[in-house]
Amino acid sequence: MSDDPRQALLQQVEAQRVAFINLQFTDILGMAKTVTLPAGELEDALGHGVWFDGSAIEGFARIVESDMYLVPDLTTYTLIPWDQHEGLATARLICNIHTPDGRPFAGDPRNVLAQVAGQAADLGYDFYVAPEIEFFLFKPDSDGHHAPIPHDHAGYFDVSTDQATLIRRQMVRALQDLGIVVEASHHEVAAGQHEIDLRHTRVIQAADQTVTTRLTVKAIAQLNALYATFMPKPIAGVNGSGMHLHQSLTDRVTGQNAFADPSDPYGLSATARHFIAGLLEHARGMCAVLAPLVNSYKRLVPGFEAPVHISWGRTNRSALVRVPRVTTGRSQSTRVELRCPDPACNPYLAYAVMLAAGLDGIKRKLPLREAAEEDLFHVDPRARGLATLPISLGEALNALRQDELIQQALGPIIYERFLDARQLEWESYRTHVSTWEVSNYLTIF
């Protein structure tokens, strides 16, 4: 095998009988995009990149500045386990986006995350994230159309009554083949709802793995005549799908968990407490990025194990930030869990803003308020002095407009174009007359 990484990859592609290479990136809204090359074109792509029209991608560029090119990240090479035919394989490379002058594109979500991760590195930290990714599996209706029809009627941790357990195992095996470490998978609370938990890893790799998991889940579901959705609240009256994000900082010199202090009642270091304070400080401002859809705010309501109040605690699952217990002697596992994100978010942007918020808490040494351990769904938040998360996408966008730190983390290109895209969605929803309104008002007024 060659010592040159590019030549080594080309040799690997040939040895694995790869016929096609998918070059993958995401748009500002987090949708995966792919350009497929015959394997014979890979050498040129590695040497010179692959040009594309950025004006055709959501939020990327105006027509007058549209030329961009993809630069494959060689460390992301993997075979796609479900896409092999007649002894020939398809592989995938995740790409960074560059402008014609060779610079990283400021509107590339992966680049935005790299910039914020670099700020953490400058402070002496590596940022680790472990997502818990929830989703629904639905079966088509009698006409073969997509409909929110759960494929089973099991509940939390249940052994499903149909093929769901086998399908989850297929998903986990595919993720393992893709090099992703899955810590657990199980049925969630609602019928047809499932969760896959990934092992913590450095933040850019964690975001890559989150996108890959969404694609894998959808592909395996389709192979089983089902469809998977990461829509936060596809069915009224039941739990929605969240993406709880476990996170920690590691000291780059010692390799020790910077959040851990076994002498603290919560096991938290001063660094961890400042980090949590930063998350709480910017919770409203970053909510539009973490919960980016109109539908997201139908999940963030009382009574369905989703956070509403801006608070933290240990046993309290109604809190926005939770500090999970760790086994005695395993302080390296100390972490905090942010519970408002949902799986429809762009993970590159979501992980960037929450890291920026936490680092702001560290830099400013923000004090952490008292923990809230009671069930906040049944208390008056005003009596506790607790603020609440936005109750709509419109309110979340206004909060984003007022949070300069989150705007800076996104950068001016992504901030402006993300805001424009989501504002259009909000205005479309706000002016839409729903079936509920017609059925409740038409014959009465």
Question: Where in the sequence are the language-model features?
Answer:
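Glycine-rich, acidic/polar active-site loops that bind/position phosphate-bearing ligands
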Residues: 1-445
